[in-house]
A protein has these predicted regions:
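Non-catalytic cap/lid and distal C-terminal segments of serine-dependent acyl enzymes
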Residues: 1-489
Length: 489
């Protein structure tokens, strides 16, 4: 690792510093050529931000190379000042021109690179994530892979609402419109550089040769909204990408974890291979629970009780609302996914077909009354959890809202929720979907609304297809949070 490299840029008229990390093999032989990853820093950072005192890319890369997830690569970390790695709107500091026309050729000349776009990637966090998406999208002839970690993407509404001084410094100086308010800030130049706009304005075919990986934590202060909008936009336009939302915020530790998947994504992309789907948990039909069915009018309720159910003990009930989706996620399959939790935490599952309930005009209170007369539980919201999948998810979601919610803990797997209430009163919400799930717009809109209402919410977007096993895996991954609610008195 050498943090003290530099060259003179004729385009910018000054020295440009950069750090370089060479693989161990590079120094031990003299003929091999290597792919290159350019790493971009965040606002206020510099060429050392990916170094030992920052994200420590050497430690991450060494571990990923040792376990065979990625080949030895050259990593270049240039200083980007506070440019968003774009040309300045007035042409006075054309950083991207320097990057493409001077820095990339210089690296190919100074080091033994493959000098091919097929083995050249650009990655960045925060401001650098914005830059990584923008550079690769505008220059697909130079880059084949773009990695955005918590890219600094503001929705138009957020962009307009930023404080004047902060906006002038960080955005107006780079993209024009300094001193402007309202929609005057949304200059044509800004739109040409911002991923939320150029992905929307240009044909999808423009971006077909670049492979995108985007990751943004659900605890981000602001950026969760812009990144969620970007994922929905890319899905709507059928632009291939990998998208992740994990538990975390705008921190080095979050991005270090991101790179553990981003680097294998780069490796697969360099090979021209599709990135593999998630490794799914394998479920059997083995279930340590007993089935009991009850009727509410013309509607059926499917109960699953732990094999050691004891009517002298008090149980909490997970109400499962089964809607229509791409898979037939039965109540039994949910019980299989949560089997161990049912045994350990004294939980009963009560499942119903939501369309049947709506057709028969069966109120949720009638369901809870029938269940609470059948099993030993308590008749209050703290003893009721809700889990919904697929269509008509409003039926159960609405039980978590209002001044007297019927359920205090709400979980959703790839759910389609249309009528969002601002009165979110449940004690926890947990939303899960794969990045190729059907209801990506709906579940993100719910998350966005819950965050705006400052409701306690966990949100996950996982790698994977819209499949039965993936849905079960998502529900299984909720076990910790469901279990936490079960042990509360």
């Amino acid at each position: 690792y050498n943090p003290d490299q530099s060259f003179y840029s004729k385009i910018l008229g000054q020295e440009i510093k950069y750090s370089v990390l060479l693989p161990q093999e590079y120094l031990s032989e003299s003929t091999g050529k290597y792919g290159v990853v350019f790493l971009l820093h965040g606002w206020g950072g510099n060429q050392s931000s990916w170094g030992p005192s920052g994200l420590n890319i050497q430690s991450i890369a060494d571990a990923q190379t040792s376990n065979g997830s990625i080949r030895p690569l050259i990593y270049i970390m240039p200083e980007g000042f506070n440019t968003y790695f774009c040309n300045r709107y007035d042409g006075k500091f054309n950083y991207m021109d320097m990057f493409i026309n001077e820095l990339v050729p210089l690296i190919d000349k100074r080091f033994r690179t493959t000098a091919s776009k097929t083995e050249r990637a650009v990655a960045g966090f925060s401001m650098g994530g914005f830059g990584a998406l923008s550079i690769a999208s505008q220059h697909p002839e130079t880059f084949s892979v773009s990695i955005g970690l918590s890219p600094s993407l503001n929705t138009d509404e957020q962009y307009i609402s930023l404080s004047q001084d902060g906006w002038n410094l960080q955005w107006g100086n780079n993209f024009g419109g300094s001193g402007q308010t309202g929609t005057g800030r949304l200059t044509s130049y800004y739109k040409s550089q911002c991923p939320l706009h150029f992905f929307k304005d240009k044909p999808s075919s423009t971006f077909q040769t670049v492979r995108y990986y985007i990751d943004c934590g659900d605890d981000e202060e602001r950026l969760y909204a812009g990144n969620g909008e970007l994922h929905s936009l890319l899905r709507d336009k059928n632009i291939k990408h990998e998208y992740r939302v994990r538990n975390g915020a705008h921190t080095d530790s979050y991005w270090r974890e991101s790179m553990k998947e981003a680097l294998p994504f780069i490796e697969r992309s360099f090979k021209g291979e599709n990135y593999p789907q998630e490794t799914l948990k394998k479920f059997t039909e083995e279930l340590h629970a007993t089935n009991k069915n009850i009727k509410v009018g013309n509607s059926n309720i499917e109960l699953w009780l732990p094999d050691d159910y004891n009517s002298e003990l008090t149980y909490k009930v997970l109400y499962y609302s089964k809607g229509e989706g791409n898979v037939d996620l039965t109540t039994k399959k949910v019980a299989v996914a949560l089997d161990s939790l049912m045994q350990i935490k004294r939980m009963i599952i009560a499942g119903f077909n939501v369309k049947e309930m709506i057709l028969n005009e069966t109120n949720f209170s009638a369901i809870t009354d029938a269940v609470e007369k059948t099993v030993h539980t308590e008749s209050n919201a703290d003893f009721r959890l809700g889990l919904t999948y697929g269509s008509e998810a409003d039926y159960l979601y609405n039980q978590s809202t209002g001044n007297a919610p019927a359920i205090n803990f709400f979980f959703a797997e790839d759910a389609d929720i249309i009528n969002l209430s601002a009165e979110n009163r449940a004690k926890i919400y947990y939303l899960d979907i794969t990045d190729e799930g059907s209801n990506y717009n709906s579940i993100f809109t719910l998350f966005n609304g819950l965050r705006g209402a400052e409701a306690p919410v966990q949100y996950r977007v996982r790698n994977g297809l819209d499949s039965e096993q993936s849905a079960q895996t998502g529900i299984y991954s909720m076990s910790y949070y469901i279990g936490e609610q079960l042990i509360k008195k």
